[in-house]
A protein has these predicted regions:
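Conserved HGGG/HGGXW glycine-rich cap/lid loop of the alpha/beta-hydrolase fold
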Residues: 43-97
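Active-site loop/oxyanion-hole signature of alpha/beta-hydrolase fold enzymes
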Residues: 86, 90-126
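Gly/Ala-rich beta-loop-alpha elbow adjacent to hydrolase catalytic centers
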Residues: 127, 131, 135
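Flexible "cap/lid" loop of the alpha/beta hydrolase fold
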Residues: 136, 140, 147-176
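Conserved alpha/beta-hydrolase catalytic His-Asp/Glu region
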Residues: 160-162, 180-236
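Short beta-strand/loop motif that positions the catalytic acidic residue
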Residues: 240, 246-248
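Acidic catalytic loop of the alpha/beta-hydrolase fold
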Residues: 251-255
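Catalytic active-site module of serine/aspartate enzymes centered on a nucleophile-bearing elbow/loop
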Residues: 270-304
Length: 304
């Protein structure tokens, strides 16, 4: 299935040119950018997304405080074989700030609204960290639409260990500058290898992130933390029959391999795979082996 997306007059066309209605608007980015920014109305919010590549569609969901640019180092290879739909979650990136508290289920509703608007009925889902938790909710809400799940560096139930870390970040967001918060979180995301020999492309990505702005706002970040604190799907995912790859860095200290094993064990069609010599942000620290594993898995589970 190949899908072409356009952002013109609120119309989405498939490869045959069939006209499809979409709840779609086009805004603009920063003043120095002339590129159209497609946004989808999801309830009271507008949610930003980007598209890239050709092939079977894949929905990409990023983690806590992150936006679609966090996929930049794996995006080119993924886009060679798949049509990517990269979403900025509510309270992050170019999407709107939420008016109040919400759950990861609400964020899954946002993601499904994007796929509705671009006219894609069935797709793969790739989620990292909080995005992996949202991906679980997407599959639970729309099991017949999700062809496969790739869950990176994620978890199925927030335990006391992870809750303590998240609560500390919630407090730090109030007390520190966004840049200081990012520096404090970096050792949780990368291994010692990164600090010994930081890859130039990751440093460039970090510099670009600092220029764009690390956080949407402190309240926005805290609302996402609160949604993560309430996450618990381990008793729900056994209902899924979706082929699922739970991918984790072998040295991930934030969502360690024990989380991946527990989640994969709860998924009837789940398998766990470790990426060697990398940590939580495996898609940044070791993008090539991460991408290779994702693409091999997706190739085994086509939409048909």
């Amino acid at each position: 299935m190949r899908v072409n997306f356009s952002c013109m007059a609120g119309v989405v066309r498939d490869v045959r040119g069939t006209r499809k209605a979409a709840r779609l608007t086009c805004g603009r980015g920063p003043a120095n950018s002339a590129r159209a920014m497609p946004r989808v109305r999801a309830g009271a919010l507008e949610v930003f997304y980007d598209t890239d590549g050709t092939g079977e569609p894949a929905l990409l969901l990023m983690g806590l405080g992150g936006e679609h640019h966090a996929w930049d180092l794996v995006r080119p290879e993924l886009a060679r074989r798949h049509r990517l739909v990269l979403v900025d979650n509510r309270d992050a990136g170019a999407s709107d700030e939420a008016p109040g508290p919400y759950s990861l289920d609400d964020m899954a509703v946002d993601a499904l609204a994007v796929m509705d608007a671009v006219g894609v009925e069935r797709f793969h889902v790739i989620g990292a960290s909080m995005g992996g938790a949202i991906a679980q909710r997407v599959a639970l809400q729309a099991p017949t639409r999700v062809a496969s799940l790739v869950l990176l560096s994620t978890w199925g139930r927030t335990d006391a260990f992870l809750a303590t870390i998240l609560a500390s970040w919630r407090l730090m967001a109030e007390r520190l500058s966004p840049e200081a918060l990012l520096r404090a979180q970096t050792p949780w995301a990368f291994t010692y290898r990164f600090f010994q020999n930081p890859a130039p492309e990751v440093r460039a990505w970090q510099a670009a992130l600092a220029e764009r702005g690390v956080l949407k706002s402190v309240p926005a970040y805290q609302r996402q933390v609160d949604a993560c604190l309430a996450h618990d799907t381990l008793d729900l995912v056994p209902l899924l029959r979706t082929p699922s790859l739970v991918l984790v860095g072998e040295d991930d200290i934030l969502t360690p391999p024990r989380y991946a094993r527990a989640l994969a064990a709860a998924l009837p069609a789940g398998e766990v795979m470790l990426v060697p010599a990398t940590g939580h942000a495996c898609f940044l620290e070791t993008p090539k082996p991460c991408t290779e594993r994702i693409l091999r898995f997706l190739a085994k589970h086509p939409l048909a």
